[in-house]
Design a protein with these regions (language model features):
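N-terminal glycine/serine-rich phosphate-binding loop of ATP-dependent small-molecule kinases
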Residues: 1-49, 199-209, 231
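Glycine-rich phosphate-binding loop plus the immediately following alpha-helix
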Residues: 1-2, 82-126, 222, 226
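Acidic-glycine-rich active-site phosphate/pyrophosphate-binding loop
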Residues: 26-34, 71-82, 133-140, 188-203
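Conserved phosphate-binding catalytic cores of ATP/NTP-utilizing and phosphoryl-transfer enzymes
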Residues: 35-88, 172, 219-229
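Adenine-nucleotide phosphate-binding core of ATP-dependent small-molecule kinases
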Residues: 138-173, 213
């Protein structure tokens, strides 16, 4: 966010044009999205990440009607229509619980990388319940479980199920009679333990693209393309 977002955006743009073998002058239109979009002055248009995720999800799979986005800062449940337009959306409260940041903190508490945490969460045997979704209290629970010599894989599975319960409850509050096909976007979609737990809670299969964390960026690019065609 802030100046950091502006610097990151400029660096990302430089890397992108270099990789594509073009110059900045070749770019006709730029659309910014995400939390830091308000701080980026180089864009022609600024569109919310909710609208961009819906656009990107529809492009990748036109049958999707519910998008679950779990990023570093928040969780979103988005209902979209047959054209990819947003019908309704809900976000978690300002607490970090269940977000990518929450998982990073739990991984650090367990002395693991996020990749290790994702793999180990699939190897669980005992169904441990993490009762608190508050980051501070959940961390305390994890420390207590480690002291009780509980298997780390079981603790991770408990965390995964807690996250899935929170996300599932958010999706249910959308109040859709027919939620259609589900897509999960955001970096947390790379965590197989989370996706398995969420599929169990939703009672449905999640469509996950190869680079789920770029779905919003894809949507922004599609909006830029449409603007160019209209010009």
């Amino acid at each position: 966010t802030g100046g950091g977002a502006m610097m990151s955006a400029e660096k990302s743009l430089e890397n992108a044009v270099e990789k594509a073998g073009i110059s900045k002058d070749d770019i006709v239109r730029i659309v910014t999205t995400g939390y830091g979009r308000a701080y980026i002055n180089s864009g022609d248009d600024s569109i919310t990440e909710i609208t961009c995720h819906a656009k990107g999800a529809h492009y990748l799979n036109p049958n999707v009607r519910t998008v679950i986005d779990i990023g570093g800062q928040d969780i979103k449940a988005i209902s979209i229509d047959e054209n990819g337009a947003v019908k309704n959306f809900l976000m978690n409260d300002k607490c970090a619980a269940g977000t990518g940041r929450f998982l990073e903190m739990m991984a650090r508490t367990l002395g693991l990388s996020l990749e290790e945490m994702s793999t180990m969460g699939l190897e669980w045997k005992e169904n441990i319940v993490i009762s608190s979704m508050c980051t501070v209290f959940a961390e305390s629970e994890v420390v207590s479980l480690v002291a009780q010599n509980k298997a780390v894989s079981d603790i991770i599975h408990g965390l995964n199920m807690s996250v899935a319960s929170k996300v599932g409850a958010l999706a249910a509050r959308l109040g859709q009679d027919n939620p259609g096909e589900y897509m999960m976007t955001g970096g947390v979609a790379k965590n197989k333990g989370i996706t398995n737990a969420l599929e169990e809670k939703l009672g449905a299969k999640l469509y996950i693209c190869d680079e789920a964390q770029l779905c919003g960026a894809l949507g922004a690019a599609l909006f830029a393309y449409e603007k160019c065609r209209e010009a």
